[in-house]
Amino acid sequence: MIRARTFTDARQQAHSNAELHWWIFMRISGLILMFLILGHVYMTFIQVSESDATFDAVVNKLANPAWKFYNWLILSLSLLHGANGARYSIEDYVRSRPNRAWVKGVFYTVIALLFAFGTVGLFSI
């Protein structure tokens, strides 16, 4: 686990390249997610008046492939970002190796199911 604020410190603390890449991913994905979600909130709640937010308007918006990809990008990045953050917590609080393996296995299965159901739900509209 890397507990660093700067890239130099992170590189010194990393036990593997994968751990360093996850550390970098968390910084980049957090920044990207911030702009994606702010854009989504603006386009969904500020740009559209409340009277125009009908079921048909939402279905028409989600029929657009660009809007589907935008939502899928938010879904996939947020699940990866959240799963990696939860991995840090699991490593910190589940001390026993066998228990940690079980907790991670169940957790990653739930994340995979959320991703699969979210993707199917998003692209079936």
Regions found by a protein language model. Give the residues of each.
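Membrane-embedded alpha-helical bundles that constitute the cytochrome b-like, heme-associated redox core
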Residues: M1-I125
